Amino acid sequence: MKLRCFFQAAAVTCLVAGCAAGSQASSKTDACSDSSAQACDAAGEPAKGDYGFIPMEFDDAVSLFQEGKSGLLYFGFPDCPWCREAVPILQQEAAAAGVDIYYIRTRDDERNRLYSDEQKERIIPYLKDYMDNDENGVLTLYVPVIVAVKDGKVTAGHVGTVDGHNAKLGEMTAEQKKQAEAEIQTVVDAAKTK
């Protein structure tokens, strides 16, 4: 199983990123756990300086899908260990392809959720393939999540880093980075296809 940041889908809300706690190694982080000291969720609108990405509010991400628009979306937050591993790769691949990245931050600096349950519910139809059930059976979005959207539909996506990588324990190996680069490049390439 991949380690990753995730957001809880129990209540309908936007994507959030948090650090997965527990014994199972994952390539993503649990972002919805408001009570978790390890929650890693992106929040608010980052300045263009945050990774050099274009800030996008959660409601605007939902509207992008509903209005049939296109773009490369990144859901995550600065304190998420898996996001910190994936962002440099995403930056590199997007720069090489000349693709802008829209950043949806799911938690603020105090790791408070920046989305409502209603917002989360509205995004589920578009991102359910990139969500998973948490240990309580609640549909959750783990971050980082990178999706290419064309005409309001996800054409490619990537969750977490790579299978077998636990960002809490260390950085990706050279082989894991190569695998992550290939997977993220596929998503970026799908976003540049007009």
Question: Language-model segments: which ranges?
Answer:
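Bacterial N-terminal signal peptides that target proteins for export
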Residues: 1-10
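The canonical Cys-X-X-Cys-His
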Residues: 80-83, 146
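C-terminal motif of bacterial Sec signal peptides marking the signal peptidase cleavage site
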Residues: 16-18
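Thioredoxin-like thiol-disulfide oxidoreductase module
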Residues: 104-155, 187
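Typically the conserved alpha-helix immediately C-terminal to a functionally engaged Cys/Sec
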Residues: 84-97
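N-terminal leader/targeting and pre-domain segments
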Residues: 5, 24-68, 170-171, 179-194
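Non-catalytic, surface beta->alpha helical segment in thiol-disulfide oxidoreductase systems
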Residues: 137-194
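Short active-site neighborhood of thiol/selenol oxidoreductases, capturing the structured segment around
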Residues: 66-78
